[in-house]
């Protein structure tokens, strides 16, 4: 999974590298970057983008917004746009939040205990009835809400792991998310994960 990043330390590291004015950079990923001006401009853009996301996240936290609200709201301005195939702004927001706040989000008492929501999914499925859950999941998919579709199909499948309708809706939601990822940010991790979920689907 994604580790919690250290934005302040990362910004300081970029400032140190910029001050060195290197002619060649050997990154951890991809090919070497050559040319002092190209390197300087690239690192300055990354530094300023990270600083922007950091500051916007802190401002949102101080305004009392939840991490999920900020993940939806915070976007890079046009002058700081970056390719997000290795990282994503919304994931960076979550990482910055946890860097300062830790794992407890102050949203639900249940976060304090080792009993996840999934432990009651089968009971929810029994009470709600799989027919109703399938209808709700399908409505979310029609409305263009594949993540909500996945939430509901997870509940349905907890009650009936082999339910063909729930499995089909889950796969349709995964395909829609994969298409969005491939036609949008093209984030490698997101694409690999979605493909792996489709490959391992029963």
What is the predicted role of each segment?
Residues 2, 61-62, 141:
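Hydrophobic/aromatic side-chain positions at a characteristic register within alpha-helices
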Residues 7-69, 73-107, 173-174, 181:
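Divalent-metal (often Zn2+) His-rich catalytic cores of metallo-beta-lactamase-fold enzymes
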Residues 45, 108-134:
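TPR-adjacent "capping" and linker segments in tetratricopeptide-repeat scaffold/adaptor proteins
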Residues 98-111, 174-201:
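Alpha-helical linker/edge segments of TPR/alpha-solenoid repeat scaffolds
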Residues 161-162:
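Short coil turns that delineate tetratricopeptide repeat
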């Amino acid at each position: 999974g994604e580790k919690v990043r250290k934005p302040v330390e990362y910004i300081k590291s970029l400032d140190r590298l910029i001050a060195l004015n290197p002619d060649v950079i050997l990154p951890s990923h991809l090919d070497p970057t050559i040319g002092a001006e190209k390197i300087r401009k690239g690192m300055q853009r990354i530094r300023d983008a990270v600083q922007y996301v950091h500051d916007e996240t802190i401002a949102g936290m101080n305004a009392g917004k939840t991490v999920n609200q900020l993940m939806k709201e915070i976007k890079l301005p046009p002058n700081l746009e970056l390719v997000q195939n290795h990282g994503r702004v919304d994931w960076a927001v979550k990482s910055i939040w946890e860097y300062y706040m830790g794992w407890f989000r102050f949203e639900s008492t249940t976060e304090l205990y080792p009993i996840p929501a999934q432990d009651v999914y089968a009971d929810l499925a029994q009470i709600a009835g799989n027919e109703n859950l399938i209808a709700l999941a399908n409505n979310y998919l029609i409305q263009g809400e594949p993540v909500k579709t996945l939430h509901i199909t997870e509940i349905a499948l907890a009650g009936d792991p082999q339910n063909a309708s729930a499995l089909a809706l889950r796969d349709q939601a995964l395909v829609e998310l994969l298409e969005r990822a491939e036609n949008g940010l093209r984030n490698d991790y997101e694409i690999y994960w979605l493909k792996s979920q489709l490959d391992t689907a029963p």
